């Protein structure tokens, strides 16, 4: 048992002060058990009594861990980090020109049917260095090719979801984007979406006009359509290299790779291979045989076998590394993609990964990262002025969606005129129709917000926006829309109050307590229910009462929260009229960012 009891003594003694156990804002079950000098199974049992299911690697919040510690007769104290552990390991900033060149990192984007995958296969089959591993390949989400003695790293990510996830967490993994457009189909909506993401990333774009073997191929039409979208090819006076290709016939592949090397030379891409490694997670999964596996793109330094690394809210020691063809390697230099084993848990795509000196330093960094809410770098109308004042941003990126084309241009023009000497307003995407998941992804990637005028939002888009804390504003009066943005850049916009549903529970039985109060025996349906939360009781879809909860119990124990799938007893202040099948919504209110 985790709880400790003291035997009665014949003599009255002054109890010694309780041992103080310092914990981070988040702690794993194993770490908590080690701190208590007890078996992790006992901690798991104690959590179960509180309605929390956990395994040995589960991370729990400080308040939950505190209850376990106090039940064991100790005092819990939140460990406060005096200095950012991340800052201690940040590589020294030196002139990049002193460092050796590194391979460029390239992402291929475009419409799903325009030959993007076949183009990747053509590049891989003609140039990939497969012979090192006897032809045995392993998909790790990235691979390297070599042309004229120079390496190029390709990120083989589906769509632009991973691309967006990396940028949404502040990780810039790509140096160059290849935009693939089919010469017969021309520019499609998904092409424009990919172009928006590439522009938002601020990286050079190479145009691959694919399917040139088709009799109906019309490359000039592609160039014209892209020019109308703001991407002008070199031969028309712009900055974009356009390479005709045929993935089917493997034509134009070498020319495309040479274009990549040309851009890389102009960009002068360099990195220091002699510092502690840092990079970004580009794929991550739980391998049923080998445990947590992360594919990492090393961006600076050299990652070595045995290194202790931190990625977001997890850490580990590099037990094994594999290159893009499945060969075990002992080190990985800048721009090298590797699959590594040894993480405590699965990191998130887009997490920055960094090598540290000690396990203690790794734990401190994980603790610090756990104290920071994992949200995107998106701003909101409410906080944009503060962000500008602090020097965090110099641009306000907006995705604008309207009901009709006639509304789009005047709103767009009005917003762009609100730019000041301190902040520039960019309309990253404008279009007609509902707000889509792609719009939210672009807002995530660009650190922007979304404005809808007389238009709706798709369910998946709303769900993603809620999860990633993307600010979406809806208007049906143009002057109000423009006025709010103007006030926002001047710091005059009042914050709005929003309601957040924490969890829902259904009443399954009603009990009378000894104090003549009714207690609702409930099953938590979703989320989590909290003691002292505001609760809305719904009966037949109608609100019967809105009151604070004053009692939350599991069996005979008072608890602070109960999660979905567990039963609990709930009491509401000054309310006794519970009925079976009533729905209880637990919620809180907070200011929008």
From Swiss-Prot:
Location of the region described as G5 in the Swiss-Prot/TrEMBL record: 246-248
Compartments where located: Cytoplasm
Region (G3) residue spans: 156-159
Region of interest (G1), residue spans: 110-117
Protein's UniProt name: Translation initiation factor IF-2
PROSITE patterns membership: G_TR_2 (PS51722)
Domain tr-type G: 101-270
Region called G4, residue ranges: 210-213
Gene name tied to this protein: infB
Binding site for GTP: 110-117, 156-160, 210-213
Keywords: Cytoplasm, GTP-binding, Initiation factor, Nucleotide-binding, Protein biosynthesis
UniProt xrefs under Pfam families: EF-G_D2, GTP_EFTU, IF-2, IF2_N
Keyword field contains Heme: no
Role noted for this protein: One of the essential components for the initiation of protein synthesis. Protects formylmethionyl-tRNA from spontaneous hydrolysis and promotes its binding to the 30S ribosomal subunits. Also involved in the hydrolysis of GTP during the formation of the 70S ribosomal complex.
GO MF annotation: an example: GTP binding
